[in-house]
Amino acid sequence: MFATSIAGSLPKPAWLAETHKLWPQWKAEGDALLQAKADATLLWIKAQEDAGLDIVCDGEQARQHFVHGFLEQVEGIDFQNKVTMGIRNNRYDAMVPQVVAPLRLKGRVHAFEAQLARAHTKKKLKFTLPGPMPIVDRVADRFYGDKVKMPFPFAELFYQEAPALEAGGGDIIQFDVPAFHVSIQDASERG
């Protein structure tokens, strides 16, 4: 028998964030935002349980964007001076943060989501992390100078966060590479 789960994120409620935008803005700040993220997460956990899914997730409700939600907790990323860059193999342009220094985690990236979700479900719990390929596709490199080498420091950060998610109650860690099909050549060059 196959275990059932969703793939990817779930839509954010209109009361949490703008809808139908690549990088939606939050509709609250401070403690009110934390509570809104928690409320949205709990609603989606309940919906997945009610649907009978075997494995539930946080729906990525606390992340503005699946890549940038990770990068917000990484030292060496400049969000203040975004630049325009072609992403998804130059399919479209986006304003992206820049890598400007060696990369280090500021602390746990998704501890809030892991603790909240684990406390509210007895089902198996899955967390999604972006893979290195989608990250390097969505940041401008102003430090490493080599797109082939740049994924490796990000991979080291995942080796820190993934076991921490597991220790925090995550049963499954999914590395998500949604635009792999537009980066086949990059994948073969980078391994």
Model-derived features: where do they sit?
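Domain-level signal for soluble alpha/beta catalytic cores
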Residues: 1-191
